[in-house]
Amino acid sequence: MNYLEIAGALIGLLYLWFEYRASIWLWPVSVIMPAIYIVVYYQVGLYADSVISIYYLLAGIYGWWMWLRHTPDKGEKPVSGTPSKLLLPMFVVLLVVFVLIGIILETCTDSTVPWWDSFTTALSIIAMWMLAHKYVEQWLAWLVVDAVSCGIYVYKDLYFTSFLYGLYAVIACFGYLKWKQLMNLSYERV
């Protein structure tokens, strides 16, 4: 039994609760959880997931800073939709990162799932950036990442983590609806 994996999964549930509520407390938790998963993923040969956990840790610091930089007179950064002008650049970044990581994993590692690992990693980079900017569609990106990751983790015998990501996928649906509601409320106040 991997106690580190269990600890990471439990902290992940706490993270999810804070994210669902659009609470700034998701950010400190988002620094702790990936620190644990760097080790867990490396142990089972999910190298891109291990590296993406380093990114998550750094993105957690960035997201925390982004959410904190709004002054009390301006209020908290509101939830908003992703500007359409960002969709093409985000897609290009997704494709480039996906191909680069996939090639590296296929040629330089013993990964048994290089392209799946690469896909979830590339999309996670985009989703985490969207979360830092409080774009509601980040939930849709996470839904795809979580569903694919759930299957990968079952394949890799990471059952607690697979359960966590299955739960993430379900809650991503509810999170999207909740954030849409928050976005609509902030538009009504304007």
Feature roles, as predicted:
Residues M1-A22, L26, H70-T71, S80-V190:
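Polytopic alpha-helical membrane-helix bundles and their juxtamembrane interface segments
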Residues Y55-P72:
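Membrane-water interface of transmembrane alpha-helices
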Residues P28-V31:
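Core catalytic region of metal-dependent phosphoesterases/phosphodiesterases
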Residues A22-W25, Y37-I52:
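Helix-loop junctions on the outward
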